[in-house]
UniProtKB/Swiss-Prot annotation:
It comes from Dictyostelium discoideum (Social amoeba). The gene is fscB. This is Frizzled/smoothened-like sans CRD protein B. It is found in: Membrane. Residues 96-109, 178-194, 259-281, 365-436 are cytoplasmic. Keywords: Glycoprotein, Membrane, Receptor, Signal, Transmembrane, Transmembrane helix.
């Protein structure tokens, strides 16, 4: 008897859904938060980003119902302020390790430069960092009321390209950095030509995987994001999540190998290895967990996508059935299977990478040396200024010495450090990375 009642209730529920989603509502009427859309070309409007509710002229609001309005604002603020700080941090590192400042390149500095160039481009996808700040919270992803931005919207396309290319570049060069640290410890060297070919291949892959979705018209704003990215599930898997999974696997292997090399070293060698590599190693591990969290979170969303759709459908059925009740907004409450805190961490982690980079690569002796030996500190104007400063703060004799010979602090410290050998004729070379 109980089973029969349960079956009857289920049948009645699905009959309600079928009735609600096939009925025609009065023109111009849609219960809040649904939005009325007078559509003359339904297919075209769907392609433009409107999400119609069944056969009605009601569309889902933008941003979507998956989170409350206050949750969406919190996500946006975290992205805006965290991204604004991080983008300037990554820009500083990009300039520092670029040919504009750094005139001595090796495998390691090239990896750092491309890594933070990718992070900078990814963060630049947050249009409100560069574009009009006077617009509303979500005007870039919701260009019209109830419409999710699509590739045909120029800002949406720009956001999608920047985010996709930046993420791909960042994660592939993060993997390269983990391999490079291990190769440095093992004294494995490769030629400049090999480095050049590798950089071309990696950047070509990033460009290829970025522009394939454009040909398939796949960039747009989704129910889960605060920007534009790839919409189709299989396009996401092929264009991003599969490459990320490969990068995470390679990165995990080489993190383990690095830790093993440090573990098996003894005495002074272990101390020197720890002192030399703890900063890049900690950064690599932090970014591994951040990329890994992004991977796990999106897997969770994909796994719960149908459940989310059912929750939204149930909520919409409720408000349509109870729209005649003035208290329907209190009767109908949407269930949210995706915790807002988990989504918040997803946005936060992707916008902390530039800040972390400055901590582990910006506040180092290597960064100081790069700037001190750069053109910007060794041109006629800067040398004249520094000479004047020394005159005002030194004795006449020290001033004459400064004018007659190159100051000791302008001698390339990296060259000096590269000549230092580890005592006891040990065979571990520590000269390529300096992060004291």
């Amino acid at each position: 008897m109980v089973i029969n009642k349960l079956i009857l209730l289920i049948l009645l529920f699905f009959c309600k859904i079928s009735y609600v989603f096939t009925q025609k509502l009065p023109d111009g009427f849609c219960p809040s938060p649904l939005i009325y859309k007078n559509s003359t070309d339904r297919i075209s409007d769907i392609n433009r980003g409107y999400q119609f509710i069944g056969e009605t002229n009601c569309v889902q609001p933008c941003p979507s119902l998956v989170y409350s309005e206050s949750d969406w604002k919190n996500f946006f603020d975290a992205s805006l302020y965290g991204g604004a700080i991080s983008i300037f941090c990554s820009l500083f590192l990009l300039i520092t390790y670029s040919p504009l400042v750094n005139n001595k390149h090796n495998r390691h500095t090239i990896s750092i430069m491309f890594l933070f160039s990718g992070i900078f481009i990814m963060l630049a996808s947050n249009g409100r960092v560069f574009w009009n700040n006077n617009e509303g919270y979500f005007d870039r992803i919701c260009p019209e009321k109830g419409r999710f931005a699509r590739q045909s919207d120029r800002y949406c396309l720009a956001m999608g390209i920047f985010y996709q290319f930046g993420c791909l570049t960042g994660m592939m060069w993060w993997t390269t950095l983990s391999v490079d640290v291990w190769m440095t410890i093992k004294k494995i060297k490769i030629s400049n030509r090999q480095i050049f070919y590798y950089a071309c291949i990696v950047n070509f892959l990033a460009i290829f995987l970025t522009f394939i979705p454009i040909a398939r018209d796949q960039y747009g704003a989704s129910n889960f994001g605060i920007g534009c990215w790839i919409l189709g599930l299989w396009d996401q898997v092929f264009g991003f999540w599969a490459p990320l999974g490969i990068c995470l696997t390679i990165g995990c292997i080489f993190i383990t190998l690095i830790m093993y090399e440090i573990y098996k070293a003894t005495g002074q060698i272990k101390k020197k290895l720890l002192l030399k590599y703890y900063k890049p190693l900690v950064l690599i591990i932090l970014m591994f967990f951040e990329f890994f969290y992004m991977f796990i979170f999106i897997t969770y969303i994909i796994d719960h996508r149908n459940k989310y759709n059912d929750e939204v459908a149930e909520y919409i059925v409720c408000i349509l059935i109870n729209s005649g009740n003035p208290n329907y907004d209190e009767i109908c409450k949407i269930k949210r299977s995706i915790p807002p805190a988990a989504q918040f961490l997803f946005f936060l982690f992707s916008r902390l990478m530039g800040f972390e980079g400055v901590i582990f690569y910006g506040l180092t002796n290597q960064t100081k040396r790069i700037w001190l030996r750069s053109f910007w500190f060794n041109n006629r104007i800067s040398l004249k200024f520094r000479s004047s400063f020394n005159i005002s703060s030194s004795t006449n004799s020290s001033t004459n010495t400064f004018e007659k010979q190159t100051p000791s602090h302008l001698v390339d410290p990296i060259d000096q450090f590269d000549n230092i050998e580890i005592s006891n004729n040990q065979n571990i070379e520590l000269s390529q990375i300096e992060n004291k």
